[in-house]
């Protein structure tokens, strides 16, 4: 979301009393002014061009709030962040029986493993606002970032962390990391719970660690891995889902053999110059593939190609401003 709202559009973010899951708005984030909070009850008065859905239940919620049906009376896309939850290769996507709402996957792996049925699909890979080269690596510990690593233990690879302690201590970041040492039967100094930090504080802290370990078995490509790379950290990565595409040869260590990854951490701990060299290569690779400008161009291309609600109702080719590629058409309300 941090990257998405940095385009040339106006982004309408619903708010509700209590700022719950249906109405968080900006959530206190330092986003551009174009990311505008709107009370949910006022959405009917807004000239919405496109709605970006992220949960299946949002389809009915949009009808309630706008009086318009996504995909039919209101152009819509469904942004799918995740891998399938239940069946790795046979699970049908919630929109698989519809052809009026494109499904946007954030990785090619996700597009491969979801059964999307009739739904048109497109891959728009992550975009990362460049935090700048911050790596120092003077703290000889590993950085590990995951939310709720106890509940999601095997999913995020938290169960593998004890195997790395022979190479170096671990600093864990994210929501729920305070429970991690006890859950793994380890001392608090072996795995230090650093907490859920703001993005700026997180970046500054992990950039001091010697390297970053990414051990997820079955998640979509983690933004924390890409952020670590753009900060200039060398990365040690379990070769699952989209990892091999994110970390090409010569940029970091990628393997399904955990012993190989532990050996890589030992090398980085012993050779700070090599750690710095690999971190610089990781940063260059991440900015080339996951740069913000490419990400925003991809989204603009998709949004400009969406058929208008008018053309859907009338059954005629669209003349919507969404398909007018003049410079004035590059700002829309989302």
What are these regions (language model features)?
Residues 212-213:
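A short hydrophobic beta-strand element within the catalytic core of glycosyltransferases
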Residues 217:
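Aromatic "clamp/platform" in nucleotide-sugar-dependent glycosyltransferases that forms part
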Residues 203, 226-230, 241-245:
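Short alpha-helical segment that forms part of, or immediately flanks, the ligand-binding pocket
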Residues 9-100, 109-112:
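Extended catalytic core of nucleotide-activated donor transferases of GT-like folds
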Residues 234-237:
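Short hydrophobic beta-strand element within catalytic cores of glycosyltransferases
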Residues 249-259, 267-272:
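Conserved acidic donor-binding segment of nucleotide-sugar-dependent glycosyltransferases
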């Amino acid at each position: 979301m941090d990257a998405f709202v940095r385009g040339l559009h106006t982004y309408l973010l619903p708010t509700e009393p209590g700022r719950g899951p249906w109405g968080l708005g900006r959530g206190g984030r330092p986003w551009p002014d174009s990311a505008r909070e709107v009370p949910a009850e006022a959405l009917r008065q807004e000239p919405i061009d496109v709605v970006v859905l992220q949960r299946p239940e949002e389809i009915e919620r949009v009808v309630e709030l706008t009086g318009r049906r996504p995909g039919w009376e209101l152009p819509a896309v469904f942004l799918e962040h995740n891998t399938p939850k239940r069946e790795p290769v046979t699970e049908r996507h919630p929109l698989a029986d519809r052809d009026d709402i494109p499904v946007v996957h954030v990785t090619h792996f996700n597009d491969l493993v979801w059964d999307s049925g009739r739904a048109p699909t497109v891959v728009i890979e992550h975009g990362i606002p460049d935090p700048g080269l911050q790596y120092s690596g003077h703290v000889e510990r590993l950085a590990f970032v995951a939310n709720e690593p106890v509940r999601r233990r095997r999913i995020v690879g938290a169960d593998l962390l004890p195997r790395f302690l022979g190479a170096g201590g671990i600093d864990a970041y994210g929501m729920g990391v305070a429970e991690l040492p006890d859950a793994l039967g380890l001392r608090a100094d072996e795995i230090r719970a650093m907490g859920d930090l703001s993005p700026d504080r997180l970046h500054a802290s992990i950039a001091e660690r010697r390297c970053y370990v990414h051990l997820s078995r079955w998640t979509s490509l983690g933004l924390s891995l890409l952020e670590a790379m753009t900060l200039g950290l060398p990365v040690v990565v379990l070769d699952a889902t989209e990892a091999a595409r994110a970390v090409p040869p010569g940029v970091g260590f990628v393997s399904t053999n955990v012993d190989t990854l532990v050996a890589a951490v030992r090398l980085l701990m012993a050779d700070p110059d090599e750690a710095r060299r690999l971190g610089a290569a990781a940063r260059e690779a991440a900015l080339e593939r996951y740069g913000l400008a490419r990400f925003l161009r991809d989204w603009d291309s998709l949004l400009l190609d969406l058929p208008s609600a008018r053309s859907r109702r009338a059954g005629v080719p669209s003349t919507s401003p969404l398909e007018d590629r003049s410079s004035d058409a590059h700002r829309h309300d989302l």
